[in-house]
């Protein structure tokens, strides 16, 4: 499985997930209007939001967390 790990104006960076990590995730942490801190990566299980400002999307196909 290949997941996106970062995005910039120059394109995306990906990584091949290690064995046992069969999900890609994208996590948004709302900071202020029009600005969120976004994290991408691989996971064995879908992470759970830690507070109401956090949204997490998990998926199972290559680069699906773009």
Curated annotation (Swiss-Prot):
GO terms for molecular function: toxin activity. Expressed by the venom gland. Pfam families: Toxin_cobra-type. One of its GO terms (cellular component) is extracellular region. Keywords: Disulfide bond, G-protein coupled acetylcholine receptor impairing toxin, G-protein coupled receptor impairing toxin, Neurotoxin, Postsynaptic neurotoxin, Secreted, Toxin. InterPro entries: Snake_3FTx, Snake_toxin-like_sf, Snake_toxin_con_site, Toxin_cobra-type. Disulfide bonds join 3-24, 17-42, 46-58, 59-64. It is found in: Secreted. Monomer. Binds to the muscarinic acetylcholine receptor (CHRM). Belongs to the three-finger toxin family. Short-chain subfamily. Aminergic toxin sub-subfamily. This is Muscarinic toxin 4. It comes from Dendroaspis angusticeps (Eastern green mamba).
């Amino acid at each position: 499985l290949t997941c996106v790990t970062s995005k910039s104006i120059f394109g995306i960076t990906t990584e091949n997930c290690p064995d046992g990590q069969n999900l890609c995730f994208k996590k948004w942490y709302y900071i202020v209007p029009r600005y969120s801190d976004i994290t991408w990566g691989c996971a064995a299980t879908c992470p759970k939001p830690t507070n109401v400002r956090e949204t997490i999307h998990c998926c199972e196909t290559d680069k699906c967390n773009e």
